[in-house]
Amino acid sequence: MKKSIWIAWKDVKIRITDRKGFMMLILMPLILTCILGAALGSVVDGGSRIDDIKVGYIQSDQSDTANMFTKDVLKKMKSIKVTKVGSKDKMKKLIDEKKIDVGIVIPNHWEAGKTSAVVNAAPDQTLKSSIIETAASSFIEQYKAVKEAASGSMDYISKTEAVKQGKLDPAQFAEKLAKTLEKETGDKLTIAEKSVGSKAVTSFQYYSAAMLCMFMLFHITVGAKSFLQEKDTETLARMLMTPAQKSVILFGKWLGTYLFAIIQFFIFLIVTINVFGVDWGGNLLLVSVLGLSYAAAVSGISMLLASCISDMKTADAIGGFGIQLLAVLGGSMLPLYQFPDVLQSVSKAVPNRWALDGFLSLMEGGGWADLQKPVLLFAAIGFCSLVIGIRRLHTR
């Protein structure tokens, strides 16, 4: 074990004194966090609060249902300001002039469900247009359900003895039922602005976690390249000639990568807390557990990669294109919620996505329950990659 620690410490000292490596893994993520957190604040922070939605409204359908949607849904929502518009051309002009955020047209026969509401908005108002579109579609779906429920109830009531004996007036009952259900339909639709967790994540928080997850990935190639460099300079061959077992030497190489990843993690954590004022959540112990397990995973993958490649060009290619691809898929470049469904599914196959989700959960007020899956996953990845990598390198 002492020999493994000695080998690990040797690698750590080499990487600390490497100015290029220090800039890449320590300073660069901090610089990018500062730039992205400030420049793209509207992309992330914009999702944590919805400003008042200015809606232009054209109502071609003059049915009671369409009137109820305007009166009991749109006009009762505090965050929506409704303006009646005379024509579609006027609506388009108001959208272009930024006087309204969203335009909605209720066409003829909307009540019957034969046509859908048409929602128009500027390209930068997709969230607000989605809210209005969802409100309209939810309302009409609830109205249909109410109508079917009322129809079914009346069919049942009309067959009862009370109606047959004249003790119950079906028309009066139907009127009361309709009013009650209509009121419920309008009252059910509200907009609640709420974070997924107990706290909302700011842009600096998001990109602090995102940059940390991305730059810790570089240890995959840094560890593999360190192994290849020592192989090319025959340093590894000289170490293998010593009485130390091969597995001890190889474990020491993994430990060196792991220790440097830990150093990077804690430096980044301390600087973002004290300089940028980033809140990583109420429990830094859980943040550390997640960071340490993620570091173990990327260090294990570095040994597996070292066992699969034999030249520096391949390592450089993976370090360039491969790591950037993982960073994009894992949400380090753009927030995950902006991904289409297909990429959302694909991103779950990369480790940095799990790490980012874990850090964000802690920032939102989550606890150990949110970390169990990623921590166990990273432990499994790190252990399996280390064992397979050492066995492959041992035979080589």
Swiss-Prot record:
Q: Which PROSITE patterns match?
A: ABC_TM2
- The ABC transmembrane type-2 domain covers 161-396
- Subcellular location(s) per record: Cell membrane
Q: Which GO terms describe its molecular function?
A: ABC-type transporter activity
Per the entry, induction is: Induced in response to linearmycins and other polyenes via the two-component regulatory system LnrJ/LnrK.
Which InterPro entries does its entry note? ABC-2_transporter_component, ABC2_TM, ABC2_TM_bact-type
Its GO CC terms are: plasma membrane
Q: Provide the transmembrane region boundaries.
A: 21-41, 204-224, 258-278, 284-304, 317-337, 370-390
- Disulphide linkage map: none
Q: Which UniProt keywords apply?
A: Cell membrane, Membrane, Transmembrane, Transmembrane helix, Transport
Superkingdom classification of source: Bacteria
The topology of this chain with respect to the membrane is: Multi-pass membrane protein
Q: Record's Gene3D superfamilies?
A: abc type-2 transporter like domain
| Chief localisation class | membrane
General function of this protein: Required for resistance to linearmycins, a family of antibiotic-specialized metabolites produced by some streptomycetes. Part of the ABC transporter complex LnrLMN that probably facilitates linearmycin removal from the membrane. Responsible for the translocation of the substrate across the membrane. Also mediates KinC-dependent biofilm morphology.
Which family does the record claim for this protein? Belongs to the ABC-2 integral membrane protein family.
State what protein this is by name: Linearmycin resistance permease protein LnrM
Q: Which organism is it from?
A: Bacillus subtilis (strain 168)
Query: What is this organism's lineage?
Result: Bacteria, Bacillati, Bacillota, Bacilli, Bacillales
